[in-house]
């Protein structure tokens, strides 16, 4: 901090939407006091994108998919000065703000993953009924009946765990529900990835093209952080 301003230096990957021409303001989280208690070192502040020292370095494709000008980018902040009044809630409350978003954000991605898993299962079933191998539809080969059944079971398990996590977040709060949130963050994306893998097998060579959208669906697997 310098007087009534904060001077920001750093580099940030995965800055969401900053290349979109409609993006005029960024919310920046950074370390404001390294000597404070562990969870009070970070702060969040509003930074207008036209502030001197703000540089969009590059767009970041994910698994080769390029969503520019949307998606994510790398941003460099070089002696960026912003008024102290732009600070959210107060100095040292950045982690607190972030935690209020992470739980709901993660369960939101799990809901999306379940929806994509349903759509992927539909594509797989349609493909299995329309494609033939050894003189009969692939769906008639026993291994695919087992895979379809397993996919349905896993989707329902993921849906129920997501609903339980959401119920607990509403009734007892995110802190008490943190175990359920963590569990569904692991379960839903892994369920999706398993179903996508089977769907790619069902589509043959077409499964690895962009024609069926299966590769893009894989991007949800690591949404909002890794699951390990």
Stretches with model-predicted labels:
Residues 5-6, 74-80, 90-95, 99-223:
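Alpha-helical interface subdomain recognition
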Residues 21-23, 40, 70-72, 213, ...:
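Short, solvent-exposed loop/turn segments at the edges of secondary structure
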Residues 224-228:
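A short, hydrophobic C-terminal helix/tail in secreted or cell-surface proteins
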């Amino acid at each position: 901090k310098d007087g009534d301003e904060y001077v920001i230096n750093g580099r940030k990957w995965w800055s969401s939407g900053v290349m979109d021409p409609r993006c005029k303001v960024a919310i920046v989280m950074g370390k404001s006091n390294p000597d404070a208690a562990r969870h009070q070192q970070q702060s969040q502040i509003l930074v207008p994108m036209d502030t001197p020292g703000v540089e969009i370095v590059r767009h970041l494709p994910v698994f080769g998919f390029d969503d520019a000008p949307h998606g994510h980018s790398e941003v460099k902040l070089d002696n960026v000065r912003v008024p102290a009044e732009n600070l959210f809630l107060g100095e040292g409350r950045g982690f607190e703000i972030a935690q209020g978003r992470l739980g709901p954000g993660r369960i939101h991605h799990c809901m999306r993953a379940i929806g994509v898993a349903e759509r992927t299962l539909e594509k797989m079933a349609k493909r299995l009924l329309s494609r033939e191998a050894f003189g009969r539809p692939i769906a008639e080969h026993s291994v695919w009946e087992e895979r379809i059944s397993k996919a349905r079971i896993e989707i329902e398990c993921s849906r129920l765990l997501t609903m339980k996590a959401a119920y607990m977040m509403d009734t007892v709060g995110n802190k008490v529900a943190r175990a359920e949130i963590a569990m569904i963050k692991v379960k839903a994306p892994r369920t999706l990835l398993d179903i996508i893998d089977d769907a790619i097998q069902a589509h043959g060579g077409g499964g690895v093209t962009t024609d069926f959208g299966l590769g893009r669906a894989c991007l949800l697997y690591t949404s909002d952080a890794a699951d390990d």
